[in-house]
A protein has these predicted regions:
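Residue-level signal for secondary-structure boundary elements
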Residues: 42-45, 49, 130-134, 145
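Aromatic/basic-lined ligand-recognition segments
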Residues: 3-6, 153-157
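Generic hydrophobic, helix-prone segments enriched in Leu/Val/Ile
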Residues: 30-39, 72, 85, 153-154
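Short alpha-helix boundary/capping elements
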Residues: 63-68, 130, 146
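Intrinsically disordered, low-complexity regulatory segments enriched in Ser/Thr/Pro
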Residues: 3-24, 66-113, 120
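Ampiphathic alpha-helical segments that act as solvent-exposed interaction surfaces
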Residues: 26-38, 100-138
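Short, highly charged C-terminal tails/helix-capping segments
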Residues: 134-155
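Negatively charged, low-complexity tracts enriched in Asp/Glu with abundant Ser/Thr
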Residues: 2-67
Length: 157
């Protein structure tokens, strides 16, 4: 395991009524994370999310050293589904008029049906190969980008 400020941690954001149930899973490395990713009940969580509306299942890995996150959510239905992959990172926004420059949490999102592409994104993320990760993203469908919402409240499961 990587320790201190160089560690990776991850959590499961489960489909639930409030859409806020987060199960912190603790520290991880690439091999252990990929096992958890493969064993996550994606389709069961997708069905719950579709029943409840306005919620989704998401797995997020945080890199404490770079203050970045890579996450995956599922959308669609059991027979026809895909994934949204998001990369959160600090981005400096230039000020306009009298506003100063500021750093925000930014997210870029991509869509894919190919789990092997997602696995490769996580491999590059754990290696901290950001250039390689961006190149891998460019092979996916660009879904959008925006300032990320910071959630201060995480109920524990």
């Amino acid at each position: 395991m990587i320790t201190g400020h160089n560690k990776f941690t991850y959590d499961f954001h489960l489909a639930d009524h409030s859409g806020l149930a987060v199960k912190d899973m603790g520290e991880t490395d690439y091999e252990n994370f990929i096992k958890e990713f493969a064993n996550f009940p994606w389709l069961d969580q997708l069905e719950i999310a579709n029943r409840l509306k306005n919620t989704s299942a998401t797995i997020t890995v945080q890199d404490s050293r770079n203050r970045t996150e890579l996450w995956t959510s599922i959308a669609g239905n059991r027979d026809n589904h895909g994934y949204i992959v998001g990369y959160n990172f600090p981005k400096t926004i230039k000020g306009n008029f009298f506003r100063k420059e500021r750093t925000v949490k930014w997210v870029i999102m991509y869509a894919t049906e190919a789990r092997d592409k997602i696995i490769n994104c996580y491999n590059l993320f754990f290696k901290r190969d950001i250039k390689g990760l961006i190149l891998e993203f460019e092979q996916l469908y660009f879904y959008g980008e925006t300032e990320a919402h910071i959630q201060n409240f995480k109920p524990r499961v």
